């Protein structure tokens, strides 16, 4: 893709009131554009990142045996009144009335809708366990939206809901999602910290939050340093992770902490996921049952959320330097930045055009007439994993310069050798 044909409205600076790195870089790199407080348009580059994250989430959810659906954003208020949660979200829930004066709402979450689906269709014990999920936009009218897409009012979320026959089955589904979440975050290049959490307005009696360590995080985490190795391991041991001490600030009691103070690490964290064992919190008031040997029994439920759009901010918070974003390859909008420093030089142009043709879908090709300094600063800001630099002196030696954005390693290599490496 040629930069001259693409829409990337980059900025040199942002307003002084923007303090968080991910907010600053997502605006400067032209990923998003604010249209109202806490509400953003996703521009081409940002949308590519968002879709890449979405695809990783979808891939791992599908591998777990979960089935994708899509539920409506607008929900009837009657379902929330039936579950007893209508007033729990207070002013965060945006309520509306349709032309027939029926009370509706913009869904901040979908427990009521999914429970209604299961209770109005015959469910046998043979259909269980069942996990349904969606990737859908949500709206919560935050009192103080801040930090850009990290805490906004409209956001993209993956929410899943499990249905089981009994407590044992529900915990198995909970553990399956626990493991699946770790796999998702590992694929994104993140090391999550799972901490026991309060269930809040979602409800239930067992809950874990997943945080990524970042100085801009709103939560303070206390954890056994061994948790890092466990969360990075390819062989994920859910029970061992659960039994390793971790706690957010509202759950940490220094007097009751089971490990010595010298083993307790303290860091800031950004919440990127939350899972809940719900039991019959929704199935009981909404009368959602399954049939077992001609007897109706209440479905045992769980729910599981990942902030897909928030992950964009979290990744930037973890992967950046003072020049810009450093995208992991799994989520990068393009794998390569191709920079022709001298577009008026025939040899530079010929080499660059050839590479653009070879790398077409994986490259953002800066073919503009901007100065070399502006081009190099822009490619650092945009943060593609690999930078391919075409300059006069290197081209005269039939070489190109390839830089790794993360490690800063550089190598001079012929175009032929470079393309051959990509084929391997």
Swiss-Prot record:
GO terms for biological process, alphabetical: prolyl-tRNA aminoacylation
CDD domains for the chain: ProRS_core_prok
Swiss-Prot/TrEMBL catalytic activity: tRNA(Pro) + L-proline + ATP = L-prolyl-tRNA(Pro) + AMP + diphosphate
Main subcellular localisation: cytoplasm
Localization in the cell: Cytoplasm
Subunit and interaction comment: Homodimer.
Protein's name according to its UniProt entry: Proline--tRNA ligase
Organism in which the protein naturally occurs: Ehrlichia chaffeensis (strain ATCC CRL-10679 / Arkansas)
Gene it is expressed from: proS
């Amino acid at each position: 893709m040629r930069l001259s044909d693409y829409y990337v409205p980059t900025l040199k600076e942002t307003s002084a009131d923007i303090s968080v790195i991910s907010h600053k870089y997502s605006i400067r790199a032209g990923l998003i554009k604010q249209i109202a407080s806490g509400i953003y348009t996703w521009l081409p580059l940002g949308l590519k990142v968002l879709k890449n994250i979405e695809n990783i989430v979808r891939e791992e959810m599908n591998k777990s045996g979960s089935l994708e659906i899509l539920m409506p954003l607008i929900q009837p208020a009657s379902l929330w009144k039936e579950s007893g949660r209508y007033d729990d979200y207070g002013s965060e829930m945006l309520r509306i009335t349709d032309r027939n004066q029926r009370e509706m709402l913009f869904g901040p979450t979908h427990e009521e809708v999914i429970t209604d689906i299961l209770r109005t269709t015959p469910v046998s014990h043979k259909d269980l366990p069942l996990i349904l999920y969606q990737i859908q936009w949500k709206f919560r009218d935050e009192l103080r939206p801040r930090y850009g897409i990290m805490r906004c009012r409209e956001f993209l979320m993956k929410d899943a809901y499990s249905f089981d026959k009994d407590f044992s089955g529900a915990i198995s589904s909970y553990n399956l999602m626990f493991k699946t979440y770790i796999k998702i975050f590992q694929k994104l290049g993140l090391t999550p910290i799972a901490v026991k959490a309060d269930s809040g307005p979602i409800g239930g009696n067992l809950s874990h939050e997943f945080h990524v360590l970042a100085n801009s995080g709103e939560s303070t985490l206390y954890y056994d340093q061994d948790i890092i190795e466990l969360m990075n391991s390819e062989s994920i041991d859910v029970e061992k992770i659960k039994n390793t001490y971790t706690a957010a600030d509202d759950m940490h009691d220094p007097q009751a902490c089971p490990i010595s103070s010298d083993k307790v690490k303290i860091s800031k964290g950004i919440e990127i996921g939350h899972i809940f064992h719900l039991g019959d919190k929704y199935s009981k008031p909404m009368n959602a049952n399954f049939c077992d040997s001609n007897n109706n029994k209440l479905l045992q439920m769980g729910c599981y959320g990942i902030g897909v759009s928030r992950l964009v901010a979290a990744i930037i918070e973890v992967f950046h330097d003072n020049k810009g974003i450093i995208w992991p390859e799994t989520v990068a909008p393009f794998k390569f930045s191709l920079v022709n420093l001298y577009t008026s030089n025939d040899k530079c142009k010929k080499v660059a055009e050839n590479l653009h043709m070879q790398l077409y879908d994986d490259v953002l090709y800066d073919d503009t007439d901007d100065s070399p300094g502006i081009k190099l600063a822009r490619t650092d800001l945009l943060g593609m994993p690999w930078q391919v630099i075409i300059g006069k002196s290197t081209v005269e030696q039939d070489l190109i310069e390839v830089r790794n954005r993360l490690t800063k390693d550089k190598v001079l290599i012929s175009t032929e050798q470079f393309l051959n490496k990509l084929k391997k």
